[in-house]
């Protein structure tokens, strides 16, 4: 906020409203303290840093899904909706922005919900040199698609079963739960759709 004492930059409509209400022009400066909100210039370094951090988070989430597909999920492909990991990364950055150490103090538990059962995929420590100040639990959700269930059933019974491995399709929905490790205040829950 920037304090100004000049009426020259004020909106003429608001000044005329004050004059219509009975204020004299000479008393306007002495009767009121005017405040103008000045939008700060965006810091280009901060914008570039945030975009870079967001892209690193996206890569970490994609690597987690890639590692988990054969080891923990037992599938050959994981189909991720466009921009899902980008939206999650932006929410993670927003939730970490109010923390004492920012994203560096984050430990993220990545899970997948399949038929109302959560399967643990990975634990991501953003900066191992910093004592964690908060935990995020990310829950990806499986797409409720009857075709994929039917397809898995159909191909597993036929001659294609030996070479066919299922494809996991993720929903565009997710859940992100934040728990502060230094506070007794309850968790923050974000449901993405």
Swiss-Prot record:
GO cellular component, one term: cytoplasm
Pfam families: RTP801_C
Keyword line: Cytoplasm
Any Gene Ontology biological process: negative regulation of signal transduction
Amino-acid biosynthesis among keywords: no
Location(s), subcellular: Cytoplasm
Species this protein is from: Pongo abelii
Chain's role: Inhibits cell growth by regulating the TOR signaling pathway upstream of the TSC1-TSC2 complex and downstream of AKT1.
UniProt key word Cytoplasm: yes
Family: Belongs to the DDIT4 family.
InterPro entries linked: RTP801-like, RTP801-like_C_sf
This protein's name: DNA damage-inducible transcript 4-like protein
Location, primary (coarse class): cytoplasm
Domain of life, source organism: Eukaryota
